[in-house]
Amino acid sequence: MYKTSKYTPTDKMSYLICDNYTLLQVMSRFDLSLGFGDKTVQEVCRENGVDCRTFLAVVNFMIEDSDRMEDDVKDISMPSLMNYLKQAHHYFLDFCLPTIRRKLIEAIDCSTENEVAFLILKFFDQYAGEVRKHMDYEDMNVFTYVCLLYTSPSPRDMR
């Protein structure tokens, strides 16, 4: 059963996973491994050098039926969030897309000269290439730029 209210630092990490096992992917992207026993979210994050507020902002965003995180934005660690997003890209590019391609090959008949099957595979490969290009651009440019903005002094501070 999925929790309907927000998780807090004092919630047990095991309860979080029992409530919603899909949050295991979020944990993985923050480099949090299993084996936390009865520890709270805050304890697990602290022991692994993960910003707890950022972790919870992402977790609570994932479980809500909303596409807004306005309440949590002021509390997140930008470097932690950028690392999470890079890990999400890595998972999608290096696991999801190859898995989809493999299943696509299994589903279509590639054993004969089937032009439609070839075109489907060609279209998917072009799509995957565009997705990779987009995510690589974000990883190399957008996330780097955001981190630079985050660490640079604001114009107000330079007076």
Functional labels for PLM-detected ranges:
Residues N60-H89:
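Hydrophobic/aromatic-rich structural module bridging two neighboring secondary-structure elements via a short loop
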